[in-house]
Amino acid sequence: MASPVRDDYDADRLQLLDGVALTPAGLVSSDSLPEALTPALSSSLLGADGYGLLVHEITGLAEVSEPELARLETKALRLHKLVQSALVEALMLLDRLPEETGYDVVLSAPVASGEAAGILIDRLRAVIADTHYGDWLGEIRHSQQGSDPHTTLASPDGGMPYVLWISVDSVANDKDLVSPELRNVLVQNARGKGLYPGEAAAAVLLHRLTEEGAGPEHGWTLERAMVHEHPPRATRRDYEKRKAMSQMLGEFWPEDDTLGVPSRIVIDAFGLPGRAVEVGGATIERWPEIDTIDDGIGVDGLCGWVGEAVTALMLVLALAELKPQEHAVILGVHAECCSRMWGLRGPVSEATDAGEDHS
């Protein structure tokens, strides 16, 4: 195998190569960004008022026969369908790798049953083994969470230099609707505030960078998220939130940054109360040339709230139609007391290295 297992990877840096995502609005890829679709009335999911809720669901998923999985956990069966429906496009990302190059696979899928998780992994491994990609598969493992890519994809005991990260979730179900974690995020009745339940399957191809290695000459560098904890958003005035977000943007992406101005901003929950004013106002203050309407993408507008799949999906959305030398900022603002920020930083051009900023 051309890629030996290593254990000296930089825990704080990854190189993002490509990505693809299956969403209710359609397929998202590096050269395709579908138009947002309006949610549809669910035939089974009811709000607290007894009326049907609007949801973002993917139609035409792969037909699978897994009675044991259905018995163990209804949600696990839905996630299995999402994985299988997106798998062909996900595996095609591996064509970007040099020939005979080893890779790992990490599946992020929040299932409660360990036995169900084992079935998901076994089925995934079997499909890969039946393709020419199977010859170079290293480790394949399951992770419950997908919010932090650096933690999810870490390989302290060693791993292949490349990793295919598949992250799926669906919160259009009764259990997630009333869960404590999502009660203040998802809309709870027909006229309530919040995000519509949604689902997605995202796949991202990444390169694990070594601690001594230089920055990549292609692709985008993804460093660990900057995380700011703060008082609940509901207890603060708009100008206070806007000022705090502007300061966070300035700290995260200083004015003297050699990369210049990011070309795109992706936001996880633009539709939650106050987020549009908070993020939009701070962005204009920090970068007057950026319009959050034209240059921003709201995940919730495209496919509602997609749970643990949101981070991987935001990475794919940031890449969509992004040019090799452009950069993107990714904002996680759905939580009441926490804000997260990632940056996709493209290679620094020779002109920029020499001190000429043409941004």
Predicted regions and their residues:
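Conserved "HGTGT" condensation-loop signature of ketosynthase/thiolase-family condensing enzymes
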Residues: 1-162, 167-172, 178-359
